[in-house]
């Protein structure tokens, strides 16, 4: 077949099923075909995203994404995107890289099902929910710390390339709820375009102060209703332990066809500093207090009852470290430990983690909220600062808790709110009322460690925790050994320096 005939056949068939503005991005590659093997590779490379779209197990994913943006199909435009000093390779060579990397990556990521029932079997009593969590790597952080990406293929670091790869993986998961970390604010609107077309609504919370990225929480508005939410700032002025710009988003959702089926989903991105586990513990205490406030249903004879909860994100901590144990075990004694939350003979933590003036108990509950619930007294005012609202006044003259919570001391104190119900401050031990499990077990059946990112070596720092839900399937994580066979991420298959996490749950109606 002549080159002209090949182009005509390619265009006639290629344009039938393409819905995006970048449908001709592979067109210029056709002219380079010199033999049948090359022609076959082109057909495979150009049509694979579309074949995946139409032969997927669900028809909900309707926007096919092509790999190479249109303006990257010639060397001059590629130099514009990547910089004049970038080493530019031919589109065919890039396509070879893409196919090789993607095939390796796809072989590592499989959906593992635990239940035999159909994943579309929604009923009046239950709903099948899929959640995806992904740290997508803010471009400005990549460019601010280029020394971290010296070993990477520079052409895979372009935002235009990474955005396509990220969206391809995110949309391909067909999740009802998507939790993204490191969503750069200036890239938000363009990133939302295909997601809005598929019916996703969103919440966005930028990190505080001068940070340029934040959290993006998306949910399918044709399936879920947003009932309540909180955008949580983990920065609290005047508190050394809480002077970092991390944030959280908490959403209370109901199933649109049956609003009595509800749950709470939260996402966060905790402090990175590997030495400051104590900071992450304090951030977690604050975040869990807000989750407790939103997820609460009622008090019963056996204690408080809560909605099902999912907590997902980049926690910047490894499995079985102090904060991890606190989340899954519900209790952690920090007094006498070092800032890494390990036992130490020097510079150990005292009995006080965060100051009582925030009115958050050692059981990760807001004191004001508890008083309102148990006594019907006062207001349920939360004593946390938030730059999106008027800052709270924590002075003694204006605090409704001054008579009960001693806010000017770090001494241990216990307060009886109701008969046989006491709360503690500065006890040296944290607890929380939830029963979290991790979706991932962090090692495979052979004892090999799973991984979500590479920080000098492949480790796990990203998690999906859940309570009172039935886990149906999980998007399997590769082991560190298998990850080492991939080109350093981001690459031409993975658009971030983290791997995405996803799981499918059965959500049942809460029984009151």
Listing of model-derived features with the role each one plays in the protein:
Residues 2-197, 207-214, 285, 340-341, ...:
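N-terminal, active-site-proximal structural segment of metallo-dependent hydrolase catalytic domains
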Residues 40-42, 46-55, 59, 64-67, ...:
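Active site of divalent-metal-dependent phosphoester/diester hydrolases
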Residues 91, 95-128, 177-278, 348-357, ...:
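Structured beta-strand-rich core segments of catalytic domains in phosphoester-bond hydrolases
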Residues 118-120, 254-259, 292-304, 331-341:
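Alpha-helix termini
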Residues 130-137, 161-189, 218, 250-251, ...:
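Active-site beta-strand/loop signature of hydrolases that rely on acidic residues for catalysis
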Residues 143-149, 169-174, 196-199, 261-269, ...:
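Surface-exposed beta-strand-to-loop junctions
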Residues 147-149, 325-328:
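Short secondary-structure boundary/capping segments
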Residues 270-289, 320, 327, 331:
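Active-site-proximal segments of metal-dependent phosphoesterases and phosphodiesterases across multiple
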